[in-house]
Amino acid sequence: MPLRDSLSNTWSHIQGFLFPMLRDEVGPLTDKQKQVVVVLEVAGIAAFVHMWPGLPGRPPADRHAIARAFVAKAVLALPQTNMLIERLIADKTLRRLCGWEHPGQVPSEATFSRAFAEFAEGGLPARVHEALIKETHAERLVGHISRDATAIEAREAPVKAAKPQAPKRRRGRPRKGEVVEKKEPRRLERQVGQTLPEMLADLPKHCAVGTKRNAKGHTESWIGYKLHIDTADGDIPVSCLLTSASLHDSQAAIPLAAMTASRVTNLYDLMDSAYDAPEIKANSEALGHVSIIDVNPRRGGKVAHEDEARAKRAANYRLAEDLRYNQRSAAERSIAA
């Protein structure tokens, strides 16, 4: 079913049936509570959470209810688990939407933390997102995929990763019979022959210090992580990848492209100058896409590149690729949302 028809049918069901039924069952809903209901209905998160009843020992807390509370925590922008618990105890309607009738049934903070850790370890949000994208884009041809990354700040100490020290060698030509170790290939070179799981395992995921130049040309630093996003036309994020903040944007481009190619069919890959690398261009072409990447002038070529761009603007000369590149603003809107 086309994406527009699928969303239209889902919204008609929510507006015409689900909201009236819930209004009779739990009472009037606020706008935020309606947002929680919509996300729960569209994502169908309970289908991705497994329960194992009948096992010996104390029965575990209802993971379906905790998963719904996990969604409510994100929709209501509650940064801490104790804030979610306080909200569930005070808000009867929200509590019943999640699946608990009485305040005493709301689990403790430790139980929530263990369950959330299970969800993160099992990749619950990523699996729900992947299934939703595949379902809604199965019969859709995406024109442009805009690739970008954004900072994710974290309240934890950065981990200093130990860099392997290369063995020192005397300067000059090697002696006769001396074996010179070859340089280890760069990550982009390694990724060309790796599978997606191998590429993902090779990316650093610890908390680190990141530095990025913003749209105004100023350098910003933060402690935490970096979220790499592929955004389709319509500002729809189709693939996301979380890495250390210190990882350069280009290092996540090839695995992110592999994830996106398994979910949607697209024509153009739009990237800024941080992704200007021959391996990324070749990978895009191998997937059957046209890559439009802003030029990264290296080795003193910046002045010549700016002069050429200025001359084109003066002559009102614009290529079709330049017009398509403007679609990359979808990535910025997706990140801002």
PLM features: what roles do these ranges have?
Residues P59-R127:
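Short, positively charged, Gly/Tyr-enriched micro-motifs
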Residues P28-L76:
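Basic, short loop/linker segments at the boundary and entry of helix-turn-helix/winged-helix-like folds
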Residues S273-A337:
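Helix-centered, glycine/charged polyanion-binding patches within enzymatic domains
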Residues P60, V106, S146, L270, ...:
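Alpha-helical architecture
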